[in-house]
């Protein structure tokens, strides 16, 4: 049976992708067959009539089972906006059934861990009537919350956790991702979050200057606390 984790964040551009890459590297080091995917992406680039998302390309570097791009990122949009807007403008209707069908394709493969990167924060509409978070809850996907350490992160983290709990979703743990090198009081923010978040801290990623080099991130993950 595949162990499936869903990675959400306290906001967009908060470090979900770097966290997925770190988790994949950690799991690979333990000898697991690990795959990361991002079902929906926007802000993509078009190269030779093919659409690619930079986050997805980074994730695919650390998949030790190889898939075609369209399997890892079935819904990719050029416009950098919310899924319900981008998909409507392309006359593509995304719903829960479609997402489940795309996810279930991985069940046909010998995979130990499937890491699913979400889109933006927790509450994101995929069409005019449905939220991404509702699908995650229905699929009973254990959630790893990425908290970007910055001014306002305490409020963002606690509100997101409250919303996830109200959705009857399962929180596996959280990852602290440092977004700014010289953030004032960053250690105080982290210490407070560690005290008030009643879920295991499974990763602490320092500020990474080179956003194109996600290697050697496994050392910042301690997932063994919860698996």
Curated annotation (Swiss-Prot):
Cofactor(s) named in the record: Mg(2+)
EC number, UniProt record: 6.3.3.3
Positions with a binding annotation for Mg(2+): 17, 55, 117
Catalytic activity as recorded in UniProt: (7R,8S)-7,8-diammoniononanoate + CO2 + ATP = (4R,5S)-dethiobiotin + ADP + phosphate + 3 H(+)
Active site: 38
GO annotation terms (biological process): biotin biosynthetic process
Location(s) in or outside the cell: Cytoplasm
Chain sites annotated for binding substrate: 42
Molecular function via GO: ATP binding; dethiobiotin synthase activity; magnesium ion binding
Pfam families, A to Z: AAA_26 (PF13500)
Gene Ontology annotations for the cellular component aspect, listed alphabetically: cytosol
Function: Catalyzes a mechanistically unusual reaction, the ATP-dependent insertion of CO2 between the N7 and N8 nitrogen atoms of 7,8-diaminopelargonic acid (DAPA, also called 7,8-diammoniononanoate) to form a ureido ring.
Protein name: ATP-dependent dethiobiotin synthetase BioD
Organism: Wigglesworthia glossinidia brevipalpis
Organism classification: Bacteria, Pseudomonadati, Pseudomonadota, Gammaproteobacteria, Enterobacterales
């Amino acid at each position: 049976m595949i162990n499936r984790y869903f990675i959400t964040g306290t906001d967009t551009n908060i470090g979900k992708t770097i966290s997925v890459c770190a988790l994949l590297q950690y799991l690979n080091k333990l000898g697991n067959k690990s795959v990361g995917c991002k079902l929906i992406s926007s802000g993509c680039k078009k190269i030779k009539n093919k659409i690619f998302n930079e986050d997805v390309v980074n994730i695919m570097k650390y998949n030790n089972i190889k898939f075609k791009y369209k399997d890892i990122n079935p819904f990719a949009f050029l416009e950098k906006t919310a899924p319900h807007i981008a998909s409507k403008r392309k006359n593509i209707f995304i719903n829960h059934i479609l997402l489940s069908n795309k996810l279930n394709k991985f069940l046909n493969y010998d995979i130990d861990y499937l890491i699913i990167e979400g889109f933006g924060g927790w509450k994101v509409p995929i069409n005019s009537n449905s939220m991404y978070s509702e699908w995650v809850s229905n699929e009973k996907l254990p959630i790893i919350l990425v908290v970007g350490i910055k001014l306002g992160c305490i409020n963002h983290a606690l509100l997101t956790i409250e919303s996830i709990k109200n959705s009857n979703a399962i929180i596996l743990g959280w990852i602290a991702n440092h977004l700014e090198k010289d953030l004032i009081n960053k250690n105080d923010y982290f210490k407070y979050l560690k005290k008030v978040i009643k879920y295991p801290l499974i990763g602490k990623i320092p500020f990474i200057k080179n956003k194109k080099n996600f290697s050697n991130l496994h050392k910042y993950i301690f997932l063994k606390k919860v698996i």
